[in-house]
Curated annotation (Swiss-Prot):
Stretches for region Leucine-zipper: 208-236
Compartment annotation: Cytoplasm, Nucleoid
Family annotation (CDD domains): MukF_C, MukF_N
Pfam family for this entry, one: MukF_M
Protein name (Swiss-Prot/TrEMBL): Chromosome partition protein MukF
Main location, first listed in the record: cytoplasm
The species this protein was found in: Escherichia coli (strain ATCC 8739 / DSM 1576 / NBRC 3972 / NCIMB 8545 / WDCM 00012 / Crooks)
InterPro entries: Chromosome_partition_MukF, MukF_C, MukF_C_sf, MukF_M, MukF_M_sp, MukF_WHTH, WH-like_DNA-bd_sf, WH_DNA-bd_sf
Superkingdom to which the source organism belongs: Bacteria
One cellular-component annotation, GO: cytoplasm
NCBIfam families (alphabetical): PRK05260.1
Lineage, top ranks: Bacteria, Pseudomonadati, Pseudomonadota, Gammaproteobacteria, Enterobacterales
Task of the protein: Involved in chromosome condensation, segregation and cell cycle progression. May participate in facilitating chromosome segregation by condensation DNA from both sides of a centrally located replisome during cell division. Not required for mini-F plasmid partitioning. Probably acts via its interaction with MukB and MukE. Overexpression results in anucleate cells. It has a calcium binding activity.
Record's keyword annotation contains Metal-binding: no
Amino acid sequence: MSEFSQTVPELVAWARKNDFSISLPVDRLSFLLAVATLNGERLDGEMSEGELVDAFRHVSDAFEQTSETIGVRANNAINDMVRQRLLNRFTSEQAEGNAIYRLTPLGIGITDYYIRQREFSTLRLSMQLSIVAGELKRAADAAEEGGDEFHWHRNVYAPLKYSVAEIFDSIDLTQRLMDEQQQQVKDDIAQLLNKDWRAAISSCELLLSETSGTLRELQDTLEAAGDKLQANLLRIQDATMTHDDLHFVDRLVFDLQSKLDRIICWGQQSIDLWIGYDRHVHKFIRTAIDMDKNRVFAQRLRQSVQTYFDEPWALTYANADRLLDMRDEEMALRDEEVTGELPEDLEYEEFNEIREQLAAIIEEQLAVYKTRQVPLDLGLVVREYLSQYPRARHFDVARIVIDQAVRLGVAQADFTGLPAKWQPINDYGAKVQAHVIDKY
């Protein structure tokens, strides 16, 4: 767990005094990654200057840079890495001119971010949580046993500070890396949809499902172990309440509790945000499909009219009498059944006016649920509204009610992944499947 004992002015003065600075253009960063990769293949973790020059040569060739000044540029790059405390140089009088180089903690941290921490592993997270659970249980047992100050430092404070806190930081880093991966997936989906949304649908579905599954897997693993971890932290906290000289342990336990709560809460929040993005992408795809169908129909109709004199055509339509003995006399055909899906500009103006009036009335009536924070059962509400209108308008009224209701909030049961029960909404067999909206 990150903890700063110095104040901000002290840290600023310290950084200025030591002339700390990092400048890594893409070629220098590539060189550092190459050094880290080659260094990982060696048991001793040491590299000679000649090996660094060879690594620089590979990077220089990849960037199509001239090879005539390779020695000078490699020497400048190595010296720059040493100056920025990314590499440590060791020399000896016996082997003058043959220096040995090792990556510094700063260099390892930068390369580790780019190389090793890019993959999410449920097994790795489970092992980390298992280690944390074991350390916390031993620390809680030691806290309940009690002892002198040395006992608290060695058996309680040290495991919490140098094992549990560091693993919590590692899990937090994993979440932040997944935040970056989510943003990268969003960029990939945007590029796919901008190129050819027809061919991109399957790829988008794969990216969305993989990211959603990874987030859910991470959160399920955290929540499964979260209660047990919090219980052991509470045991330690209860044991320190009777000791006035253990403020340092109590403060550390509080920090760990806050860190664990933050990790679990952000995991759930990231899932909620991703669900919203998933719905947004699917809505965009559905809109694109509808627009494309109407665009193709309009294009064919326009082309047929333009080429009428070259290729005449005839339009035949049938207007058969209604079978009064087989149909309800009061039933009116809806426009959608006759014309199919049409753009809003081609819909009947009268129906638009009626729909807008109904939407305004229903929106005002449903707002009471949000104001009073009362759960909204869509099945009951839709059934109540449909009982006030003729059967021919049931579909349109139900659609308006549902559109206005989902704008008020969401159902927390949607996030459980369990399907809602089907509820009848009229006496003619129509049903709706929706959870109770309880989060506005």
